[in-house]
Amino acid sequence: MAHKKGLGSTRNGRDSQAKRLGVKRYEGQVVRAGNILVRQRGTRFKPGKNVGMGRDFTLFALVDGVVEFQDRGRLGRYVHVRPLA
């Protein structure tokens, strides 16, 4: 006779890959045009001066310069790139 009952399989045991979202370049860092500044879902950060936004809401530098963050309260948080003089 069997010593164990037949066991059903569990419906757990899956997880999705981490998406590596977040801020990639911080305030005061020097960046080149095209550098990714923030990877995000939706507009947690909005593009400011000299910053572009991709279809997936990725923010990137349009010019060489220094990264700046600005919190405008209910208007949202903005990322700017101040051009190198």
UniProtKB/Swiss-Prot annotation:
Keyword NADP attributed? no
Keyword Ribonucleoprotein in record: yes
Q: Where is this region: Disordered?
A: 1-21
Kindly state one GO CC term assigned in the UniProt record.
Answer: cytosolic large ribosomal subunit
GO biological process terms, semicolon-separated:
translation
Q: Which domain of life is it from?
A: Bacteria
Q: Which InterPro entries match?
A: Ribosomal_bL27 (IPR001684), Ribosomal_bL27_CS (IPR018261)
GO terms of molecular function:
structural constituent of ribosome
Q: Say which family it is in.
A: Belongs to the bacterial ribosomal protein bL27 family.
- Subunit structure, interactors included: Part of the 50S ribosomal subunit.
Function of the molecule: Found on the solvent side of the large subunit.
Give the protein name, as stated in the record: Large ribosomal subunit protein bL27
Q: Which organism is it from?
A: Thermus thermophilus (strain ATCC 27634 / DSM 579 / HB8)
